[in-house]
């Protein structure tokens, strides 16, 4: 991989220059002024008056730049003083840090000043971070400072998957872990707090496997370098993702405001400039020019071109562009396959494109809703791996490992203050006669899940106990997602408990504080006190008229909204400003505040409510003259089983998307074919696309695409096709490589440690054998593996032997077998690994030991065996050679 220079010295404007303007370029400053002026009415409605604030010229221009481009949620939810204080903190950091005088104006403006990194909740993290970090790095070089800040982040948090709502940096630290998007948000915030330009980079979807990833680039002395957030390495441009990133199709970042850097611009919006940095990671990439034509072959201007990567069994949209007057647009990507979807005025077309082989592609708008498109089969091939790794000495690696172990100890000391399973159960038993019967364990689970937020939860429960509503408090907590338990303050919970509906109500559709992915906020007391009685009556008794009220009274500003940055429902009421998502949340929040059942459907993401007059469920359509019950039909999928796949999983093996406004939108089901579609399932009427795919061990996918229509009152029957390619190794399941187990060393009875599989195996392929002691199937497995010892050692990847119980391990004698030197030993923790394998591989009663899995750290299983199996060793060798 390479770093990328972004500095043209002749044009550089250093912060120590003589300009008294925040933006030295007169033309760009005028453009910002014009863009801010276009928002003047919005700022007035939001109560923002920059002229009334006591600021210097540079401070005012900085805030004008921010307010010209910040998303609606940030305009409305935060006071101007919040952004002014952060500007002043930035100036302090640039003045006090030795590299501050060398940061160019452009990089300062776009990659240091903005508080927002992605779609996280904004907080005051920068103040906390600066106080901790400044003394620690003030005498370092800029490059060493970047590495040191990442070590500091590792002290605070490690990786753990979670839901799509992005925690604030302080919430991530409070929890002591976060998913990659949260870790990278934390690191960017930390780097910016000390005046180092930083940006979050992400591949929206991997091409060779499911999921995605986010990391960080930091600007150091004129170049951009990358690093894995909270995963410190001895040098920059190194992370576990070097190899997979070399197989990436697209890497991009959203730059705040209008940006004129050297990178390829994917698109410009009213808020940000999306840039493509694939060339930093993929040694080879190429551009493809797309021409969109109508059914007569004429170029189409303004057609929407969507670039899609196969991931999680759907063609996931990763970039959008519009065609020019000649019907053309282009995108640079890694050398693999993408699906290109084009649409305009109710017509669409699509084509698989191979980057590196095709330079110009023409796609016609040849289809429309309901088109009888033929069954389509295709192979989708990702780029080949071509990683470039920087040199790291043994001494550097050893020192980095030593530091990481120390940082783990600091973080673990903090985590030790959280509830454990035992202490949480002891706490819950104090109230055992006040909860519903036998709820001790569930309350204990809530306390463990609250992590560093446990005091907010226990204070909430204590007060509820004193007020005689403990059981209701428990029910409220049961409606929350785990992330809500980790970052929701008591004040928010109090609002939803004490101002919730009296008497019996729907927990899910009235009592629950959550609507979509928003940060939980208090609003019930406010709405009950501030919404006039006449409107409250409308909400309660004529809900369809409240839908109309929302349409007539709220100014919609989707053009300046950012996904997942929703407005506080109270501020929607106060300002009468909203975007689509915020209006939906506001509608549901107001309904629930007045005991009307309302919710967002988890599959279709359509807002629904139950009308108290007829108790029917209505879909909310803010543009309709009247609200109606949506027409329904049914879908049944037939499936002819292929080897090792008797029940395909949704969003692993297949997915369904509905055609809406020219695009196919994923329907968010959870389950398997047998659970969802073996029998006819009710669905909204409409035009749909069914995508299924068999992922091979090399990352390529053999996909099948079907189109169908659901008609009112009718059952549509379609075949779910899973292609089986006999001469290639297929991904057959999932294995959680973050699964914990007790690591042991034979002959050293006391040398134990709790580790994840990933910690033991490192990135790449591995094998796991979950075994008991002394049974014939397990002994045969050990002998089969011993028989191919040399071949498995030549493979070089770790083999983890995990005993089902400690007693099994104590009886085991390693000297009885000639196992490969690559074998590691461990003990399953309370059967958790066995349960996980049984669940993922659809086994009954935990499966038959031994359970043998070969997988990789993208959690893809390519080999599985259970119980007695002849030739196990040869099968493992054969599979390993084919990978």
Functional labels for PLM-detected ranges:
Residues 24-178, 211, 396-400, 404-575, ...:
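Secondary-structure boundary elements
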Residues 847-866:
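A short, hydrophobic beta-strand/beta-hairpin element that forms part of a small beta-sheet core
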Residues 276-284, 288-302, 312, 636-651, ...:
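Structural motif
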Residues 756-785, 798-802:
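Short active-site neighborhood of thiol/selenol oxidoreductases, capturing the structured segment around
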Residues 311-333, 660-678:
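Short, acidic Ser/Thr/Gly-rich low-complexity loop/linker segments typical of extracellular
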Residues 22, 135-141, 145-151, 160-170, ...:
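Hydrophobic/aromatic-rich core segments of domains that either
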Residues 813-849:
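Short, internal strand/loop/helix patches
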Residues 221, 326-340, 344-347, 353-359, ...:
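Short Pro-Gly-centered beta-turn/loop motif in secreted/extracellular proteins
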């Amino acid at each position: 991989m390479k770093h990328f220079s972004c500095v043209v010295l002749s044009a550089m404007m250093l912060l120590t220059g003589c300009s008294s303007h925040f933006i030295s370029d007169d033309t760009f400053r005028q453009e910002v002024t014009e863009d801010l002026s276009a928002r003047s009415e919005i700022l007035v409605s939001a109560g923002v008056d920059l002229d009334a604030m006591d600021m210097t010229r540079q401070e005012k221009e900085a805030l004008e730049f921010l307010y010209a481009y910040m998303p609606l949620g940030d305009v409305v939810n935060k006071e101007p003083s919040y952004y002014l204080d952060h500007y002043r903190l930035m100036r302090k950091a640039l003045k006090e840090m030795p590299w501050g005088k060398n940061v160019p104006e452009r990089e300062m403006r776009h990659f240091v000043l903005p508080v927002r990194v992605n779609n996280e909740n904004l907080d005051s993290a920068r103040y906390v971070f600066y106080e901790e970090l400044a003394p620690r790095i003030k005498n370092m070089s800029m490059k060493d400072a970047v590495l040191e800040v990442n070590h500091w982040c590792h002290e605070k948090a490690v990786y753990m998957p979670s839901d799509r709502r992005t925690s604030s940096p302080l919430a991530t630290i409070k929890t002591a872990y976060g998913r990659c998007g949260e870790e990278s948000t934390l690191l960017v915030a930390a780097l910016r707090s000390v005046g180092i330009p930083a940006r979050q980079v992400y591949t929206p979807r991997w091409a060779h496997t499911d999921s995605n990833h986010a990391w960080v680039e930091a600007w150091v002395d004129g170049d951009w370098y990358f690093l894995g957030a909270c995963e410190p390495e001895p040098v920059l441009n190194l992370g576990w993702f070097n190899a997979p990133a070399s197989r990436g199709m697209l890497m991009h970042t959203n730059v705040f405001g209008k940006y004129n850097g050297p990178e390829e611009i994917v698109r410009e919006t009213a808020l940000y400039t999306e840039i493509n940095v694939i060339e930093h990671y993929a040694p080879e990439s190429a551009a493809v020019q797309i021409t969109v034509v109508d059914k007569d072959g004429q170029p189409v201007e303004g057609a929407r071109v969507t670039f899609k990567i196969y991931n999680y069994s759907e063609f996931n949209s990763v970039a959008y562009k519009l065609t020019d007057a000649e019907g053309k647009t282009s995108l640079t990507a890694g050398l693999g396959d993408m699906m290109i979807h084009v649409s305009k005025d109710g017509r669409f077309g699509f084509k698989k494109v191979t980057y590196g082989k095709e330079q110009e592609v023409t796609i016609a708008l040849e289809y429309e809703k309901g088109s009888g498109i033929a069954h389509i089969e295709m192979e989708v091939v990702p780029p080949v791996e071509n990683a470039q790794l920087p040199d790291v000495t043994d001494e550097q690696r050893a020192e980095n490992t030593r530091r990481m172990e120390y940082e783990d100890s600091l973080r673990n000391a903090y985590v030790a203050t959280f509830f454990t399973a035992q202490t949480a159960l002891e706490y819950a038993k104090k109230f055992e006669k006040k909860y519903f019967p036998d709820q001790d364990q569930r309350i204990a689970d809530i306390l463990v899940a609250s992590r560093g937020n446990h005091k907010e939860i226990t204070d909430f429960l204590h007060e509820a106990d004193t007020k005689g509503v403990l059981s209701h408090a428990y029910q409220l907590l049961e409606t929350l997602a785990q992330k809500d338990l980790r970052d929701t303050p008591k004040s928010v919970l109090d609002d939803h408990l004490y101002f919730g509906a009296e008497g019996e109500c729907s927990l899910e559709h009235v009592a629950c504080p959550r609507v979509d992915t928003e940060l939980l906020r208090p609003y019930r007391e406010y709405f009950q006190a501030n919404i006039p009685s006449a409107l409250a009556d409308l909400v309660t008794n004529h809900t369809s008229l409240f839908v109309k009220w929302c349409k007539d009274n709220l100014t919609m500003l989707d053009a300046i909204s950012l996904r997942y940055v929703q407005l506080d429902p109270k501020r929607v009421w106060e300002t009468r400003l909203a975007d689509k998502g915020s209006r939906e949340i506001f509608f549901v929040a107001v309904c629930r505040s007045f005991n009307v059942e309302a919710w967002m459907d988890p599959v279709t993401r359509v807002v629904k409510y139950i009308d108290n007059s007829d108790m029917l469920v209505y879909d909310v359509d803010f543009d309709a003259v009247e609200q109606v019950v949506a027409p329904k039909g049914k879908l049944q999928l037939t499936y002819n089983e292929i080897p090792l796949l008797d029940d395909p999983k949704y969003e692993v093996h297949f997915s369904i998307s509905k055609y809406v406004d020219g695009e196919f939108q994923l329907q968010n089901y959870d389950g398997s074919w047998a659970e969802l579609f073996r029998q006819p399932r009710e669905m909204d009427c409409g035009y749909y696309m069914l995508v299924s795919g068999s992922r091979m061990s090399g990352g390529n996918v053999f996909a099948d695409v079907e189109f169908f229509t659901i008609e009112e009152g009718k059952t549509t029957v379609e075949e779910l096709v899973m292609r089986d390619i006999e001469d290639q190794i297929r991904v057959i399941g999932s294995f959680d490589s973050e699964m914990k187990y007790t690591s042991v060393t034979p002959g050293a009875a006391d040398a134990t440690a709790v580790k994840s599989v990933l910690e033991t195996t490192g990135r790449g392929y591995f094998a796991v054998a979950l075994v008991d002691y002394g049974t014939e199937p397990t002994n045969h497995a050990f002998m089969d593996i011993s028989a191919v010892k040399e071949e498995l050692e030549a493979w070089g990847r770790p083999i983890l032997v995990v005993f089902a119980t400690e007693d099994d391990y104590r009886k085991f004698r390693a000297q009885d077998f000639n196992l490969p030197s690559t074998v590691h030993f461990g003990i399953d923790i309370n059967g958790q690994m066995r349960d996980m394998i049984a669940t993922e591989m659809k086994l009954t009663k935990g499966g038959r030991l031994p359970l043998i899995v070969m997988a990789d750290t993208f959690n893809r299983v390519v080999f599985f065996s259970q119980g007695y199996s002849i030739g196990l060793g040869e099968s493992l060798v054969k599979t390993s050679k084919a990978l």
